[in-house]
């Protein structure tokens, strides 16, 4: 390894080891939950849009927000299967077109 041409090759081989974080570092997900009771008022524990195996505290639907008609009321003691929470009290999840539901004032 005394050949000066080997230095760039050695650096290239060692660079991934130098840039890799130590094992044990992990992403911290804020707002992670297992059930509604772990979330604050006006929120529910819904499936993450990005990682389906994770549930996060999500705001309940306001007027005009997309919703799912089968989303259970808060608090729900089981595990939610949708990424949306139910609409806020006084609102209903109503169909606006073939495959679209939004939170609207109850009549």
UniProtKB/Swiss-Prot annotation:
An MF annotation (GO) of this entry: G protein-coupled receptor binding
Single GO BP term: circadian rhythm
GO cellular component assignments: extracellular region
Disulfide-bond pairs as recorded: 33-45, 39-57, 44-85, 67-93, 87-103
Keyword vocabulary terms for this entry: Biological rhythms, Disulfide bond, Neuropeptide, Secreted, Signal
Secretion signal span: 1-26
UniProt tissue specificity: Expressed at high levels in testis and at lower levels in brain, lung, ovary, spleen, thymus and uterus.
UniProt keyword Metal-binding present: no
Places the protein is found: Secreted
Xref: InterPro entries: Prokineticin (IPR009523), Prokineticin_domain (IPR023569)
Induction line: Activated by CLOCK and BMAL1 heterodimers and light; inhibited by period genes (PER1, PER2 and PER3) and cryptochrome genes (CRY1 and CRY2).
Functional note: May function as an output molecule from the suprachiasmatic nucleus (SCN) that transmits behavioral circadian rhythm. May also function locally within the SCN to synchronize output. Potently contracts gastrointestinal (GI) smooth muscle.
Family: Belongs to the AVIT (prokineticin) family.
Annotated protein name in UniProt: Prokineticin-2
Name of the coding gene: Prok2
